[in-house]
């Protein structure tokens, strides 16, 4: 599989590094407006190939490097300038994404486009509108990382292997995201039943759930406060998405996609558990949510829809989670 990564910053290079270690791609191209940076990242990574898996890595600022890509991963975008409104930034990044999609499609006929740039749900919609590709081939990294954070936080509290925890963050990758506690389980045991043993020891389950969710939702803010940016976690999350596409694994991941209809809203992107394979999103799983969770998901979808409409109507969107 050939993977092209647009954006050679810390997120893009972390994705390339994780993808290389997993042996997911036979060829990786890194493209950035700063051609020297992209070339340097590619050269640095290529020197580690003898210790992992055979892979050809190239970098530069020419989109011809993306020719015949199976998957195009987009991490590019720009930061907010002093005095710039969120709408101005969002519209600017939407133009950047549109330009990237147009450039990539000149060299690859029917790639899967994997959006990582934030706000990921809105920009997934932008890529879908610009590309003209089927919905199933436009994927956002969505809440894949948020879901991993939730599972790790549950595992830390319960002293478990996080791979044995099955819980999902759904909706927006941002402050309106929700945890689907009603579907969460440990080894097939519903999470609330699993926690019954702790209740006898004085554990206040609902307060623990609330704290775990808040730590999950606000994780990016804490990381950015400590080190300035997040990139390793999202690098591994995106490499996992690429792995299931390359191997046609039909794994279930909480990626973002543009839903044709949801509770009266058309063409709204958000994350729910989805089956991924070589064609992209093979199917979307119907979650049995509680009434409160369904209301939360509906609210999250409305938040995303409002951000999309703000681009079209020149209205100021609300803030979103940085990563």
Curated annotation (Swiss-Prot):
Record carries keyword Ion transport: no
Activity regulation as described: Allosterically activated by fructose 1,6-bisphosphate (FBP).
Any one Gene Ontology cellular component term annotated for this protein: cytoplasm
Reactions performed catalytically: (S)-lactate + NAD(+) = pyruvate + NADH + H(+)
PROSITE patterns referenced in this protein's UniProt entry, alphabetically: L_LDH
Binding-site list for beta-D-fructose 1,6-bisphosphate: 151, 166
Main location: cytoplasm
A GO molecular function held by the record: L-lactate dehydrogenase activity
List of residues binding NAD(+): 11, 32, 63, 99, 116-118, 141
Residue numbers bearing the Phosphotyrosine modification: 221
Class of this enzyme: oxidoreductase
Protein residues bound to substrate: 80, 86, 118-121, 146-149, 230
Gene3D superfamilies assigned: Lactate dehydrogenase/glycoside hydrolase, family 4, C-terminal (3.90.110.10), NAD(P)-binding Rossmann-like Domain (3.40.50.720)
Subcellular location: Cytoplasm
Gene Ontology terms describing biological process: glycolytic process; lactate metabolic process
KW Repeat (keyword) present: no
CDD domains hit by this protein: LDH_2
Keyword tags: Allosteric enzyme, Cytoplasm, NAD, Oxidoreductase, Phosphoprotein
Similarity comment: Belongs to the LDH/MDH superfamily. LDH family.
Function description: Catalyzes the conversion of lactate to pyruvate.
Protein name: L-lactate dehydrogenase
Organism: Kosmotoga olearia (strain ATCC BAA-1733 / DSM 21960 / TBF 19.5.1)
